[in-house]
Swiss-Prot record:
Gene field: bioD
Xref: Pfam families: AAA_26
Organism: Aeromonas hydrophila subsp. hydrophila (strain ATCC 7966 / DSM 30187 / BCRC 13018 / CCUG 14551 / JCM 1027 / KCTC 2358 / NCIMB 9240 / NCTC 8049)
Pathway: Cofactor biosynthesis; biotin biosynthesis; biotin from 7,8-diaminononanoate: step 1/2
Keywords tagged on the record: ATP-binding, Biotin biosynthesis, Cytoplasm, Ligase, Magnesium, Metal-binding, Nucleotide-binding
Catalytic activity: (7R,8S)-7,8-diammoniononanoate + CO2 + ATP = (4R,5S)-dethiobiotin + ADP + phosphate + 3 H(+)
Protein name (record): ATP-dependent dethiobiotin synthetase BioD
Function, as annotated: Catalyzes a mechanistically unusual reaction, the ATP-dependent insertion of CO2 between the N7 and N8 nitrogen atoms of 7,8-diaminopelargonic acid (DAPA, also called 7,8-diammoniononanoate) to form a ureido ring.
């Protein structure tokens, strides 16, 4: 049976891709045929090969199972706006079935484990009726929560955690990502979250100047996920 994890964040730009990429590298190092799935992206660049999203490319490259880009990122839009608005402007629709069909194709391609990266935060609209979290619930995927370390992260983390649990989904673990070189009372914030979040703490991502180029293997404890 193929195992999948959904990576969400407490906000936009808190390090979901960094964590998803690091997880893929760790799983690959353990000999697993792992794949990345970034089903929805906006802010894509035009290339000779079509629209490309840097986050999706990084997941594609980190995975041990080679897959074509269109399988990794089926819903790709150029404007850097909310994906459902970008889809509407492109006369497209992001559907629950389309998201599931994409995941099934990756499973059928031979993946043993799939790291699925969300877009935005937990409650990302797909249209005026559905949220990306509806799909995660439909797939009954365990969730990995990325906490961006900044002022307000305690509230953001607790709200996101509560929302995930209210969807009756398990939180497989959580990661804190240092967004800045210095944060007042960082350790106290981390200690508070470790006391309040009843889920495995997978580790800390340090602040680095070029995070998407950094090799952060060894920073995360994936044993609770295996």
């Amino acid at each position: 049976m193929v195992k999948s994890f959904f990576v969400t964040g407490t906000d936009t730009d808190v390090g979901k891709t960094l964590v998803a990429r690091t997880l893929l590298l760790e799983f690959a190092a353990h000999g697993l045929r792992c794949a990345g799935y970034k089903p929805i992206s906006a802010g894509c660049a035009r290339t000779p090969d079509g629209l490309r999203n840097l986050d999706a490319v990084l997941l594609q490259e980190a995975a041990s199972l080679p897959l074509p880009y269109d399988l990794v990122n089926p819903y790709a839009y150029e404007p850097p706006i909310a994906p459902h608005i970008a889809a509407s402007e492109a006369r497209d629709a992001i559907t629950l079935k389309g998201l599931s069909d994409g995941l099934r194709q990756i499973e059928q391609a031979g993946a043993e484990l799939v790291v699925v990266e969300g877009a935005g935060g937990w409650f990302l609209p797909l249209d005026r009726k559905h949220l990306l979290s509806d799909w995660v619930k439909q797939e009954n995927m365990p969730v990995i929560m990325v906490v961006g370390a900044k002022l307000g992260c305690l509230n953001h983390a607790l709200l996101t955690f509560a929302a995930i649990r209210n969807n009756n989904l398990p939180v497989a673990g959580w990661v804190i990502n240092r967004l800045h070189g210095s944060m007042s009372h960082y350790q106290e914030n981390l200690d508070t979250l470790r006391g309040l979040l009843p889920a495995p703490f997978l580790g800390e991502i340090p602040f680095v100047n070029n995070p998407l180029e950094a090799d952060l293997r060894g920073r995360l404890d994936i044993s609770p996920l295996l």
